[in-house]
Each structure stands twice: as structure tokens, then as C-alpha cells.
């Protein structure tokens, strides 16, 4: 009894609060028990003090302490009727009605009155959705920024096409807030790091020509998408086809009699997802002329770590300069598109797993690089890229995108790192041990020691089926030591295009889980959220709102968080949709199988019924014949049977049987039908009035015994068509027998 007495039960109604609000709203509309008047721009609003004080901190401070029976609160000029009317409806109905005309004023009134339980993100979303005029302002601002940003020293050219140049400039602009690049005259010359004046002059000339030639040709609609999320995706999901950002990269000489050494420099802070270096081997005539003068500047930059300055693992690589051969090619051709480019390969540096390995790997790579760069090179008299058309370029790039999208997976980190691997027993042995996972692109994927992570290592030069007019160009082939120039065989022609990797948003499979999760994690890494993306996805709606209130987040972080959650919801919805479709398909398959089995059973049943029906007809026919033989029927009985018999089976066989049984057939037939008043007619083949037909047949037939077989042959079809009338005949026979 003690347990039952101490037990307490609570009843909680889910509609009580809603009904109370509805009742209060009805009282407000009818001006019942309203004790406060709010004046907004001369317009009066009647309300209840308790409701206003509970919904707004401003009204709570104005109303509490007032003892007047009828209180009037006059709001300042900041509060307008258009902004206050939806708020008072929200206080009584918990519904806030917004439109393009009143969203700004309602937002100002909410901030001024300190209205509770209204999310600020709602206004940000609606402003972002309604106000389309901001896109034009962004275009003007971005145009102004592009003109001044070209003078910065982190030069990002594209040696393939003008659209690649536009993409690189857009990427550079979008990274301006989070990437701080050094100036060319202050930070690039530090300590023992040097840059030669000819190289700086060529770079400055390239930048000037870029700013003057491409200033009017920039397609601002393509560079300025309408929404910020598209801008963010536009700036982060494209791997730049040309960016020199390897950590502390140095250009070393490859000839023993070299007198000068060009060095790339480091020391600047930068953040780049992928560091890409293009190796240009065009304009061989210019290179040969430099060789005759005794100097052979290296067109490549091997990774070399400066002594005494080890880099931490999480440090980002600096932005460097391009190779000298590429700049000479640019100066001599005078074209931003760089028609002399022969090969593009992607090269980045893998993060070092141990601090002591920083001094061992660069020196080993440098020795192997110097050894491989001494190899023979074939001379090429013509540039194959000049014969290439823009259509072939686009086809090759689209094919590359299609192959790359199949390889990217969610298991790999969102910032994929392309790293050259060091050969152990030589380039040939390392090449034989590798496994090509994409035969056309020649992409080889190395297996990382960490479980669940895979990194792209080498993009080898491959045979492009759509570019068949490329001339073979000789260069040293070494896949394992970081040298990305290849010796082409006489039967093979290298494809010089770099693969542009799309990471999710550019692909049409937006509902796929792999691309969406990869893009979400990429944005999470870039915006630097205080919590991971998995937590954003797994939380419920209330917990998610509480989490946002606990942290002070910037608009960029809020956009990223909502984008991640939206993508996760879309992915879950797509998975559920696919599951429903699969369930429907399975149900349809089961129904089809069920209908097929039912059809087979019905066909078998029909065959069985038909066979049974044939047997039954035969049995009834035999039974009727037997009964008619045994019973001597009177003429009246025969007439009754003929009246109820069907047209398909008359009783003529009875007459024939009776005629056969008598010695004088003619007398028997005439005596049977003597009482019939039916006039003689033409003999029908089989039908009603069979008695008259039989009588006429008897009268016309000669009085011989040979007429019986002829009658039997004429009545044979009627005898075979025994149906339901046989059953009626049998029942009539039983009735006459009983009489």
C-alpha cells in the first residue's frame, strides 16, 4: 500500500498551450480582457500585458511596475506598423508571416523589441532568398578587386586555355580572406634564398600582360555566381591546373659546368588544398641556345628541405614561381594560353609522418632527380599543341573528369594530397609493382599505412584516344622519384592535358552520398568549424539549434553548417527514395511471379475441366442410348422429349434406334408419328421439328431395309453433338418412367 500511495502520475496535454494561445488571440480580436494599448505610427493595437511581457524584453521593462488600469505604450519611430503587426500575431499564434516587403522591417523590430523565440538564421535565409539586388553589387565589387589583385606576387597562370585562367583568378580571389601571400620584393629574399633578376623580370612581364590582356575578357557572370554557396563551391571544388605551392621548392642545375643556380623560395604562410606544378618541355630551340652558352636552367623544381628550418607537419606550403622554361615559352610565344605546353602533370608533396624524415627524403629525392635529369632527350622540331583544336581539348578534359569522378571516394580525406613516392629498387621495379586502377588515365593509387586512407600518387602521361595528332617528344621517364617527364615510345603518343578533378558539386550526381559527404567535409575543413561535420549531421533539430546558440559563429560558418546539414538531409532523403523504389520493384516482382503462378494453375485447371467435360459427354451419350434401347417409348413420350430437347442434339437417334429394332422400318416410323399434325417439310440437318423431318424421310425413302443405314449416316452429326440437352432428356426419361 505504501508504494501505491507514494506513486504520482502526471498528465501532460500536447494541445493545451496551443488552445490557450488560440483563446487569447480570439480575446484580442474581440477586445476582451485587453489591458494595454500599443501605439505604432498612430495606429492602435489592443493586447494583453502578460502576453507582451512574456514575449518581449522591451515590453517587460515597460509594463512591469505600471499600476494604471488602462495602459498605453507608444513605440518609437524605429518600430513600424509593417514590422510590428506580424510580431503581435506571432505572440498570439506562434506563426510569423514574412514577405519580401516586410522582412527587413520585421527584422529591425525583432532586434529593437527583443522578441523571444525567433531565430536570426530565418531572417538571414529570407534576406538571402528575397534580395536579388546583392548579386549586382557583388559583381561590381569583384570587378574592382580583380584589377588590383593581379599585382600580387602569387601568380597563378594556366598554360592550357583562357577558361582555366579565369578559374585560377576566381580561386585566387575567393581565397584572399584566408590565404596571406608574400610580396615579391620583401618576403621572397630571406636568408640564403635567392631569385635571379631575369626570372623576376619574366614573371613581372607575365603579370602585366595578364592584367592588360585579360581585364576586359573576364566573364563576370561566370566568376560571380548568384549565391554564396555556389561561390564557395566554385572556389574550392576545382583543382587548379597550375599552382606552384610546394613547400620550399628549389630549382637545381643539371649540368656540371653550370654557373648560376635558380632557387625557389619559402617562408611564407599559405593554405592550398592541392599543389600543382606544370612541367613545360616546349620551345626546344630556346633551350638548345641556352645550352650552347654554357648555362642550362633546370625546368623542374625538386623538393628540397632547407637545412636548420624543419617544417611542422601542419604547416602549409608557400606559393612559388614557375619554371624558367615555361616563362621563356611565354615570352617567346606572347600568348597567355601557352601553345608550347607539351605535358601537364600533377605534383604535390605528401605530409611527413616523422620529424626526422624531413632531412632524409628531400636529399634522396634530389640525388635521384639529378641522376634522372641527365638522361638523353630527343629533339622536337614542331609543337604538337599548336595543331590541337579546342574541341579536342574539351573532349579530353570531359573524359578526364568522368574517369576521376569514379575514383574519388569518401574514404579519402577531403583535401586529397598527391605525393610522389621514393623508389626503393629502381624505377622499373617500382613501375612493375604498381597497379593501374584507371587504364586510360594511368592513375595509380598508393596504399597508405593508415587504415581507411588512400592518397593519389602519380598522374602518368597516358594515351589519349581523342588526341591522335601529337608528336612524340623525348624526355626521361622516372615514375617513382618525382620526375614527371616521360619517354614516349614510337607507337604511343602522350596526352599532355592535366586532369581537372571535380569534387562533388560539379557532378550531376548530387544525390550520391560519396560526393556530398566529401564536399561537406571539405567545407568543414576550410571554414574551421568548432565541431565536426558528423556531429552536425547526427543531431536532432532541437539539439542542433541549442548547439548553434552555444557557439558564436560567423555568417560563413553558419552557411557552411546549414549547407552540411542540408546535404545530409538530401542524402538521407535520396537513400529513402531509393529504398522505396527498390521495395516497389520487389513488390512488383513478387506480384508478377504470383500472377504467373496463378495463370499456370488456371491453365492446368482449364485443361482438366475440358478433359472431364469430354468424358462426361461421352458417358451421358452412352447412357442415353442404353436407356432408350431398354425402354419402349410411346409417341407421346417422344413428342415430349422432342419439345424439351435442344436444337444441337435432337432425338432423331432414338427414332433411328427404334426403326432398327423393328423388322418393318416404314410401318414403325408411320405408326410413331401418326398422331402428329405437323405438315411435312424439307428435312433440316439438325434442329427442332425433328419428328416431322424424320417422317418425311420415311415417306420419301423406299420401303426397303437399306434406308436405315442411310438415315444413320445422316443423323450421325446430331448424335455426336450431345450436350446439356442429353441431361434434360435423361431427366424426362426418368419422369416418364415414374408415370
UniProtKB/Swiss-Prot annotation:
<keyword id="KW-0805">Transcription regulation</keyword>
<dbReference type="GO" id="GO:0001227">
    <property type="term" value="F:DNA-binding transcription repressor activity, RNA polymerase II-specific"/>
</dbReference>
<dbReference type="InterPro" id="IPR008917">
    <property type="entry name" value="TF_DNA-bd_sf"/>
</dbReference>
<dbReference type="GO" id="GO:0006355">
    <property type="term" value="P:regulation of DNA-templated transcription"/>
</dbReference>
<dbReference type="GO" id="GO:0090575">
    <property type="term" value="C:RNA polymerase II transcription regulator complex"/>
</dbReference>
<keyword id="KW-0597">Phosphoprotein</keyword>
<dbReference type="InterPro" id="IPR043321">
    <property type="entry name" value="bZIP_BACH"/>
</dbReference>
<dbReference type="InterPro" id="IPR050457">
    <property type="entry name" value="ZnFinger_BTB_dom_contain"/>
</dbReference>
<feature type="region of interest" description="Basic motif">
    <location>
        <begin position="565"/>
        <end position="581"/>
    </location>
</feature>
<dbReference type="GO" id="GO:0001228">
    <property type="term" value="F:DNA-binding transcription activator activity, RNA polymerase II-specific"/>
</dbReference>
<protein>
    <recommendedName>
        <fullName>Transcription regulator protein BACH1</fullName>
    </recommendedName>
</protein>
<dbReference type="GO" id="GO:0006281">
    <property type="term" value="P:DNA repair"/>
</dbReference>
<feature type="modified residue" description="Phosphoserine">
    <location>
        <position position="196"/>
    </location>
</feature>
<keyword id="KW-0238">DNA-binding</keyword>
<dbReference type="GO" id="GO:0003677">
    <property type="term" value="F:DNA binding"/>
</dbReference>
<dbReference type="Pfam" id="PF00651">
    <property type="entry name" value="BTB"/>
</dbReference>
<dbReference type="GO" id="GO:0000122">
    <property type="term" value="P:negative regulation of transcription by RNA polymerase II"/>
</dbReference>
<feature type="domain" description="bZIP">
    <location>
        <begin position="560"/>
        <end position="623"/>
    </location>
</feature>
<keyword id="KW-0539">Nucleus</keyword>
<feature type="compositionally biased region" description="Basic and acidic residues">
    <location>
        <begin position="346"/>
        <end position="364"/>
    </location>
</feature>
<comment type="similarity">
    <text>Belongs to the bZIP family. CNC subfamily.</text>
</comment>
<feature type="domain" description="BTB">
    <location>
        <begin position="34"/>
        <end position="100"/>
    </location>
</feature>
<keyword id="KW-0804">Transcription</keyword>
<dbReference type="InterPro" id="IPR046347">
    <property type="entry name" value="bZIP_sf"/>
</dbReference>
<comment type="function">
    <text>Transcriptional regulator that acts as a repressor or activator, depending on the context. Binds to NF-E2 DNA binding sites. Plays important roles in coordinating transcription activation and repression by MAFK. Together with MAF, represses the transcription of genes under the control of the NFE2L2 oxidative stress pathway.</text>
</comment>
<keyword id="KW-0678">Repressor</keyword>
<dbReference type="GO" id="GO:0005634">
    <property type="term" value="C:nucleus"/>
</dbReference>
<dbReference type="InterPro" id="IPR000210">
    <property type="entry name" value="BTB/POZ_dom"/>
</dbReference>
<feature type="modified residue" description="Phosphoserine">
    <location>
        <position position="448"/>
    </location>
</feature>
<dbReference type="Pfam" id="PF03131">
    <property type="entry name" value="bZIP_Maf"/>
</dbReference>
<dbReference type="GO" id="GO:0098531">
    <property type="term" value="F:ligand-modulated transcription factor activity"/>
</dbReference>
<feature type="region of interest" description="Disordered">
    <location>
        <begin position="344"/>
        <end position="391"/>
    </location>
</feature>
<feature type="region of interest" description="Disordered">
    <location>
        <begin position="679"/>
        <end position="708"/>
    </location>
</feature>
<dbReference type="InterPro" id="IPR004826">
    <property type="entry name" value="bZIP_Maf"/>
</dbReference>
<dbReference type="GO" id="GO:0045944">
    <property type="term" value="P:positive regulation of transcription by RNA polymerase II"/>
</dbReference>
<keyword id="KW-0832">Ubl conjugation</keyword>
<dbReference type="InterPro" id="IPR004827">
    <property type="entry name" value="bZIP"/>
</dbReference>
<feature type="compositionally biased region" description="Basic and acidic residues">
    <location>
        <begin position="376"/>
        <end position="391"/>
    </location>
</feature>
<keyword id="KW-0010">Activator</keyword>
<dbReference type="GO" id="GO:0003700">
    <property type="term" value="F:DNA-binding transcription factor activity"/>
</dbReference>
<dbReference type="GO" id="GO:0000978">
    <property type="term" value="F:RNA polymerase II cis-regulatory region sequence-specific DNA binding"/>
</dbReference>
<feature type="compositionally biased region" description="Low complexity">
    <location>
        <begin position="699"/>
        <end position="708"/>
    </location>
</feature>
Amino acid at each position: 500500500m505504501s508504494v501505491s500511495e507514494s506513486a504520482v502520475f502526471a498528465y501532460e496535454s500536447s494541445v493545451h498551450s496551443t488552445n490557450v494561445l488560440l483563446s487569447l488571440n480570439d480575446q484580442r480580436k474581440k477586445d476582451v480582457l485587453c489591458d494595454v494599448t500599443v501605439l505604432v505610427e498612430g495606429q492602435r493595437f489592443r493586447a494583453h500585458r502578460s502576453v507582451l511581457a512574456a514575449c518581449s524584453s522591451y515590453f517587460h521593462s515597460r509594463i512591469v511596475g505600471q499600476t494604471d488600469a488602462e495602459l498605453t505604450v507608444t513605440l518609437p519611430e524605429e518600430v513600424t506598423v509593417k514590422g510590428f503587426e506580424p510580431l503581435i500575431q506571432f505572440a498570439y499564434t506562434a506563426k510569423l508571416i514574412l514577405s519580401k516587403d516586410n522582412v527587413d522591417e520585421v527584422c529591425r523590430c525583432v532586434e529593437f523589441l527583443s522578441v523571444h523565440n525567433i531565430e536570426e538564421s530565418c531572417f538571414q535565409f529570407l534576406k538571402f532568398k528575397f534580395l536579388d539586388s546583392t548579386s549586382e553589387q557583388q559583381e561590381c565589387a569583384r570587378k574592382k578587386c580583380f584589377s588590383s589583385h593581379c599585382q600580387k606576387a602569387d601568380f597563378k597562370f594556366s598554360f592550357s586555355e583562357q577558361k582555366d585562367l579565369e578559374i585560377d583568378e576566381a580561386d585566387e580571389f575567393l581565397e584572399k580572406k584566408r590565404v596571406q601571400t608574400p610580396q615579391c620584393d620583401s618576403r621572397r629574399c630571406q636568408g640564403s634564398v635567392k631569385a635571379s633578376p631575369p626570372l623576376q623580370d619574366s614573371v613581372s612581364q607575365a603579370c602585366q600582360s595578364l592584367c592588360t590582356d585579360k581585364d576586359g575578357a573576364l566573364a563576370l557572370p561566370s566568376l560571380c555566381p548568384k549565391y554564396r554557396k555556389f561561390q564557395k563551391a566554385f572556389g574550392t571544388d576545382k583543382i587548379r591546373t597550375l599552382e606552384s605551392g610546394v613547400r620550399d621548392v628549389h630549382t637545381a642545375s643539371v649540368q656540371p659546368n653550370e654557373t648560376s643556380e635558380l632557387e625557389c623560395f619559402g617562408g611564407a604562410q599559405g593554405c592550398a588544398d592541392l599543389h600543382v606544378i606544370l612541367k613545360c618541355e616546349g620551345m626546344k630551340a630556346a633551350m638548345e641556345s641556352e645550352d650552347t652558352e654554357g648555362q642550362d636552367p633546370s625546368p623542374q623544381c625538386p623538393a628540397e628541405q632547407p637545412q636548420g628550418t624543419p617544417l611542422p607537419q601542419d604547416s602549409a606550403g608557400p606559393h612559388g614561381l614557375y619554371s624558367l622554361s615555361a616563362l621563356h615559352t611565354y615570352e617567346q610565344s606572347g600568348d597567355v594560353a601557352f601553345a608550347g605546353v607539351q605535358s601537364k602533370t600533377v605534383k604535390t608533396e605528401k605530409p611527413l609522418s616523422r620529424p626526422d624524415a624531413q632531412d632524409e627524403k628531400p636529399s634522396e629525392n634530389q640525388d635521384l632527380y639529378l641522376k634522372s635529369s641527365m638522361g638523353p632527350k630527343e629533339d622536337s622540331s614542331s609543337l604538337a599543341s599548336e595543331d590541337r583544336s579546342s574541341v579536342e581539348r574539351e573532349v579530353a578534359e570531359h573524359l578526364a573528369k568522368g574517369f576521376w569522378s569514379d575514383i574519388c571516394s569518401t574514404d579519402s580525406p577531403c583535401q586529397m594530397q598527391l605525393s610522389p613516392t621514393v623508389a626503393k629498387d629502381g624505377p622499373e621495379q617500382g613501375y612493375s609493382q604498381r597497379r593501374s586502377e584507371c587504364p586510360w588515365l594511368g592513375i595509380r593509387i598508393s596504399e597508405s599505412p593508415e587504415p581507411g586512407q588512400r592518397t593519389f600518387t602519380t598522374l602518368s602521361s597516358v594515351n589519349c584516344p581523342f588526341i591522335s595528332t601529337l608528336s612524340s617528344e623525348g624526355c626521361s621517364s622516372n615514375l617513382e622519384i618525382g620526375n614527371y617527364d616521360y619517354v614516349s615510345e614510337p607507337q604511343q603518343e602522350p596526352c599532355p592535358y592535366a586532369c581537372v578533378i571535380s569534387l562533388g558539386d560539379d557532378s550531376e550526381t548530387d544525390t550520391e552520398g560519396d560526393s556530398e559527404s566529401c564536399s561537406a567535409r571539405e567545407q568543414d575543413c576550410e571554414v574551421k568549424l568548432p565541431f565536426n561535420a558528423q556531429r552536425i549531421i547526427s543531431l536532432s533539430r532541437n539539439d542542433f539549434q541549442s548547439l548553434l546558440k552555444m557557439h558564436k559563429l560567423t555568417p560563413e560558418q553558419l552557411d557552411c553548417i546549414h549547407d552540411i546539414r542540408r546535404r545530409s538531409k538530401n542524402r538521407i532523403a535520396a537513400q529513402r527514395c531509393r529504398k522505396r523504389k527498390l521495395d516497389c520493384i520487389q513488390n512488383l516482382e513478387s506480384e508478377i511471379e504470383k500472377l504467373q503462378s496463378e495463370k499456370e494453375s488456371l491453365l492446368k485447371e482449364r485443361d482438366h475441366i475440358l478433359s472431364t467435360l469430354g468424358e462426361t459427354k461421352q458417358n451421358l451419350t452412352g447412357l442415353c442410348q442404353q436407356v432408350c434401347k431398354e425402354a419402349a417409348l410411346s409417341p407421346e413420350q417422344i413428342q415430349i422429349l422432342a419439345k424439351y430437347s435442344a436444337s444441337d442434339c435432337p432425338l432423331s437417334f432414338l427414332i433411328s434406334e427404334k426403326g432398327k429394332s423393328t423388322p418393318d422400318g416404314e410401318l414403325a416410323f408411320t405408326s410413331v408419328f401418326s398422331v402428329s399434325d405437323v405438315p411435312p417439310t424439307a428435312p433440316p440437318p439438325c434442329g427442332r421439328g425433328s419428328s416431322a423431318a424424320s417422317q418425311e424421310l420415311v415417306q420419301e425413302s423406299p420401303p426397303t431395309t437399306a434406308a436405315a443405314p442411310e438415315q444413320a449416316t445422316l443423323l450421325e452429326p446430331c448424335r455426336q453433338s450431345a450436350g446439356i440437352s442429353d441431361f434434360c432428356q435423361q431427366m424426362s426419361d426418368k419422369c416418364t418412367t415414374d408415370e
